[in-house]
Amino acid sequence: MSQAALNARERAAEKNAARRSNGSQLAGVIFLLMVLGTILWGGWVVIGWMKDANRLPLSKLVVTGERHYTTNDDIRQAILALGAPGTFMTQDVNIIQQQIERLPWIQQASVRKQWPDELKIHLVEYVPFARWNDLHMIDEQGRSFSVPSERMGKQVLPLLYGPEGSERDVLEGYRAINKVLAANKYQLKMVAMSARHSWQLALDNDVRLELGRSDRMGRLQRFIELYPMLQQQPDKRVSYIDLRYDTGASVGWAPVFIDNQGGEPPINGQQNSNP
């Protein structure tokens, strides 16, 4: 066979191979497009299925954590305030968390979903340490919050008063004062700090102490030394002790009623003394 014939045959074979290669590539591209189309269509169907409110609705609620003031209905109403709950796939738990943490006695909430239809919520409530300005509470860190009064029951807490934003200062003062009084067998009931940082106390026997703005602890020590002598006064009960002096104190006496066994009218005595 001549060289020309051989060359022609080789060129024909190369053309046939090229056509087969192009056909294979085209078939591969078509197959890839079909696969991608199937995936996209399947994803669209799944997304539509997940968004369907009748598919995987969040129908179970589990609330955990130590609770003293929070009811299941509180949580349920907080969630419903956002509208109808979403499905397992569409509901944003961060929104629910923020909504629950709006309850003024909730310190922290964590929310998560559990397959297939459960919403789990863990709560951390504020723990009241004292009452603040009658309307609120503060915790051990001096953070102010509120609890519905009907849910507090008969819980007895210290009474603290002060300007807005002074919670931590008043709490720190209460702790320092209470430590000294408790060591001397006195029970502190109330602490108030005015806008001018003047301090007033009340003991559990309703004796009121005026400490003023300076030398708070020194004046408190003066009360501890003075009060036992005042208690020895016959037929008298201390109402208040004003310690806002460099030395001594001003004492107010409360009315005392004596048992009327001799037919005499009750004695209603009150006087001030300056030791």
Swiss-Prot record:
POTRA domain: residues covered: 56-126
Positions on the Periplasmic side per record topology: 50-275
Spans within the Cytoplasmic topological domain: 1-28
Transmembrane segments: 29-49
Pfam families in alphabetical order: FtsQ_DivIB_C, POTRA_1
UniProt-listed GO biological process terms: division septum assembly; FtsZ-dependent cytokinesis
Record protein name field: Cell division protein FtsQ
Species per Swiss-Prot/TrEMBL record: Yersinia pestis
